[in-house]
Structure formats: C-alpha cells, structure tokens
Amino acid sequence: MKRVRRTRSFVVDALCDEVDLSRRHVARVVDSFVSVVTAALERGETVELRDFGVFESRVRKASVGKSIKTGEVVSIPSHCVVVFRPSKRLKSAVRGYRSGEVGAD
C-alpha cells in the first residue's frame, strides 16, 4: 500500500466539506489550533483530545551517540521532544484500515 502524505491544505479542504464555513475561516481555525497546542506544549502542558489522542512534551535525557560519518563518540545533551499517544479508538480505526478490514463490505 502506497503511503499518501496529507498537508495542511488537505485538512482545510476536508474541514470545509464538513462544515459550512469559508476556506479562509477554516484555515484560520486550523492555524489557531496548531498555535494553541504548540503554546501548551512549550509550557510543559499536556493536550488531550478524547477519542483522538494526547500530545505532550517530555525531556529526553542526555546520552552518548556515535557520528555516522566519522564514527566519533559524541554527547547528546538533554532536550525536549513532542510525543503523541493515540487513543484506543484511533489505534483501532487505523489497525482496521491497515489490515484491510475497512471498506471490505
């Protein structure tokens, strides 16, 4: 199965089809949503969307790695990463799709 990449534009168009709002208005809502989630994660907060998943930021500990080019050992400082944990409902929907169960009617 070939992977298809969907962009912000696809999301905006799909939402326009779902609701009776202009493309410009929906684009502003999508941008605002991304800004709100980003700001919350920057403050170390967790964002939970029921039946979709949880966004959170975590601190990854400092570690030691190896340069692929030179083989030299390098230290990797601790840093924040964004983690998304899908809900059971989302996992189940994707699992069904990937195994060919969806649309098999």
Curated annotation (Swiss-Prot):
The keyword Iron does not apply. Keywords: DNA condensation, DNA-binding. GO terms for biological process: chromosome condensation. It comes from the Bacteria. Pfam families: Bac_DNA_binding. GO terms for cellular component: cytosol. One of its GO terms (molecular function) is DNA binding. SUPFAM superfamilies: IHF-like DNA-binding proteins (SSF47729). Histone-like DNA-binding protein which is capable of wrapping DNA to stabilize it, and thus to prevent its denaturation under extreme environmental conditions. Belongs to the bacterial histone-like protein family. This is DNA-binding protein HU. It comes from Treponema pallidum (strain Nichols). The lineage of its organism: Bacteria, Pseudomonadati, Spirochaetota, Spirochaetia, Spirochaetales. The gene is hup.
